[in-house]
Swiss-Prot record:
InterPro entries tied to this protein: FDM1-5/IDN2 (IPR045177), FDM1-5/IDN2_XH (IPR005379), XS_domain (IPR005380), XS_domain_sf (IPR038588), Znf-XS_domain (IPR005381)
Protein name: Protein INVOLVED IN DE NOVO 2
GO molecular function, one term: RNA binding
Organism: Arabidopsis thaliana (Mouse-ear cress)
Designated gene of the protein: IDN2
Role played: Forms a complex with FDM1/IDNL1 and FDM2/IDNL2 that is required for RNA-directed DNA methylation (RdDM) and that functions at a downstream step of the RdDM pathway and downstream of small interfering RNA (siRNA) formation. Required for de novo DNA methylation, siRNA accumulation and siRNA-mediated maintenance methylation. Required for several post-transcriptional gene silencing pathways. Binds double-stranded RNAs (dsRNAs) with 5'-overhangs through its XS domain.
Length: 647
């Protein structure tokens, strides 16, 4: 049951002018059509939303239509313009939006009593389509200018609606003399419109005001005459025929029935073709899903192989590291035992010297000197042992930190890979669910209830998988932050190692990336000039090219595509003007030194264009890893330890 919505006090207190009635009526019609104002209480009961205080609260459809039309077309001053406009909007809403449903709700016994004019008429008779009626003998008056005037078609239309003919429009016909006294009554294009038109024709015929009555020459005619437009009206050489030919065609009921049957058959054929196309599309989607599943299985197998290989390499590195640490610990224990043995020997010797009896001064002096030397050696050995123990603890701590960092990095890699596998699996499930969803959507268009139910289940699963994917993304971000902190710690260790190894002359050391080598420039100057001022000239040229290297606007590189690969790399542009002049002037030595420095700067510090330091494996001529640097540090520590032991 719908509830009546009452207009606000602002709407009741304020009124509108007659020029604003159409705009206000359109607004009220949209409110009615949008459901803001309820009109229907039940299939056969209606209510006026603008008259809530009326004694009669429930109307039949025709009664409400008559009430709304009477108020809307009232000439009484008691009715405000707003009331008239709102009731006219109600008339429009009843006619255009509730007419069909109201006629369907009419009792079947009443419809049968009225009969069906379509069944009783000649189906081969040509009628004007869209269905139209003709009204003649409409009263007119003569104006001062001699032109005729008559009432508008809306009043006549409302009258016909109240009589149950339900026209969509009544259009008076005008010519140069004004109102012609005739009008065209337009009905809906469907079978209901034909039904109303035939009722219109039958009503006037029964009343003695049909077409035959109008054509009889039996004296003056009183009242309106009407009939449905037929072929003779359509072909007539008058204002009615001209208007009918402009707005309609001649068709029989049989032709329209056949045309409707053809359209229905064409619709069925199109639907069948659409079903076949949907089945074909569904088959293609299933085949595509099968191909993608096979490709995904291959990728998963490949990933599993790579993962196993990665695990084996990590285990091998860990075993080598543990073996190296164990070796350091064993050497440390060996040195401790050696120092302990030496200390005991010195104590025994001191005890022996103390027990000797020295009778002469020379022997006592010698004994005193020996005792002092032994005490000095013992003190030095104790200090060395303390230093050794301190160094051992630092090395052990460094090795333990390296082992712990590697284990943490290994665990993070395993977690990330496990998370990546889980994320890929969920993404695969999401893609498969989306593929199934596309298939089900095509199947759901055929109206299968089971398919619709399966689509709902897939929607629910898809939402759960997307929620799991969001949780994994959140966890992934947490792991990325932890990995960044670990990388920062490794970078700090790398910097500390660089500071320690700056002055070392070993295979693993520190190299200044982007620094020009002096020797090629000196050699080139010696070949080009005499021995005088060679070094000064070389320094000047060297400083000039160091300035060029720092210039960020100078970028003598070009991008080339690698063979059998899709990526591009930057290489030296040998067509650069400065480099060509350098090679032509000083030869290959300085040219190679400059290009090498350019490549190093472009690789290690392209934005800053200044010299940076890196751990370098001079033997292999490549960047050294942190593990190589730590290994070299431990080797140097062992050498220093052995030297101290030998001393």
């Amino acid at each position: 049951m719908g509830s009546t919505v009452i207009l606000s006090s602002d709407d009741e207190d304020s009124d509108i002018s007659e020029s604003e009635m159409d705009e206000y009526g359109d607004k009220m019609y949209l409110n009615l059509k949008g459901g803001k104002l309820k009109v229907r209480l039940s299939p056969q009961a209606f209510i006026c939303p603008y008259c809530p205080n009326k004694k009669k609260t429930s109307f039949q459809y025709k009664d409400l239509l008559q009430h709304a039309s009477g108020v809307g077309n009232s000439n009484s001053d008691k009715r405000s313009a707003k009331e008239k406009a709102s009731h006219l909007a109600l008339v429009k809403y009843l006619q255009q939006d509730l007419a069909d449903s109201a006629s369907e709700a009419e009792p079947s016994s009443k419809r049968q009593k009225n009969g069906n004019p379509i069944q009783d008429c000649d189906h081969d008779e040509k009628l004007v389509y869209p269905w139209k009626g003709i009204v003649v003998n409409i009263p007119t008056t003569k104006a001062q200018d001699g032109r005729s005037a008559g009432e508008s078609g809306s009043k006549l239309r409302d009258e016909y609606i109240l009589r149950g003919f339900n026209p969509t429009r009544v259009r008076p016909l005008w010519n140069y003399l004004g109102h012609s006294g005739t009008a065209i009554v337009e009905f809906n294009k469907d079978w209901n419109g034909l039904h109303n038109g035939l009722l219109f024709d039958k009503a006037y015929t029964v009343d003695g005001h049909g077409k035959k009555d109008w054509l009889k020459k039996d004296g003056p005619k009183l009242g309106l005459y009407g009939w449905i437009a037929r072929a003779d009206d359509y072909n007539g050489n008058n204002i009615i025929g001209e208007n009918l030919r402009k707005t309609g065609d001649l068709k029989t009921i049989a032709e329209l029935t056949e045309e409707e049957a053809r359209k229905q058959e064409l619709l069925v054929q199109n639907l069948r073709q659409l079903v076949e196309e949907k089945k074909k599309d569904m088959k293609e989607i299933e085949e595509l899903c099968s191909v993608k599943s096979e490709e995904l299985n291959q990728l998963m197998e490949e990933k599993e192989k790579n993962q196993q290989k990665h695990y084996r390499e990590l285990n091998a590195i860990q075993e080598r590291t543990m073996s190296h640490i164990q070796k350091i610990v064993d050497d440390h224990e060996k040195l401790k035992r050696l120092l302990e043995s030496e200390r005991k020997k010195l104590e025994i010797k001191c005890n022996e010297l103390a027990k000797r009896e020295v009778h002469n001064g020379t022997e006592r002096m010698k004994l005193s000197e020996d005792l002092e030397q032994n005490a000095s050696k013992n003190s030095s050995l104790e200090l060395a042992a303390m230093e050794q123990q301190k160094a051992d603890e630092e090395v052990k701590k460094l090795a333990e930190d390296q082992r712990r960092q590697k284990e943490e990095l290994h665990e993070k890699i395993i977690r990330l890979e496990r998370q990546r596998d889980q994320k890929q699996a969920i993404e695969l499930e999401v893609e498969q669910l989306k593929g199934q969803l596309n298939v089900m959507k095509h199947m759901a268009s055929d109206g299968d209830a089971e398919v619709v139910k399966e689509v709902d289940i897939i929607f629910k699963d898809l939402g759960e998988k997307e929620a799991q994917l969001a949780d994994l993304d959140k966890f992934n971000q947490t792991l990325i932050l932890r990995e960044r902190r670990t990388n920062d710690e490794l970078q700090e260790a790398h910097k500390e190692l660089v500071n320690i190894m700056k002055e070392w002359n070993t295979n693993i050391g520190v190299k200044r990336m982007g620094e020009l080598v002096t020797k090629p420039f000196v050699d080139a100057m010696q070949q080009k000039y005499c021995q005088q001022d060679v070094e000064d000239r070389a320094v000047e040229v060297l400083q000039l090219w160091e300035h060029y290297l720092k210039d960020s606007d100078w970028h003598p590189f070009k991008r080339v595509k690698l063979e059998n690969e899709d990526r591009e790399v930057e290489v030296i542009d040998d067509r650069d003007e400065k480099l060509r002049e350098l090679k032509a002037d000083l030869g290959d030595g300085p040219y190679n030194a400059v290009t090498k420095a350019l490549l190093e700067i472009n690789e290690y510090n392209p934005s800053g264009r200044y010299i940076t330091t890196e751990l370098w494996n001079f033997k292999a001529d490549k960047k050294a890893t942190l593990e190589e640097g730590v290994t070299c540090l431990l080797d140097q520590w062992e050498k220093a330890k052995r030297k101290r032991g030998m001393a």
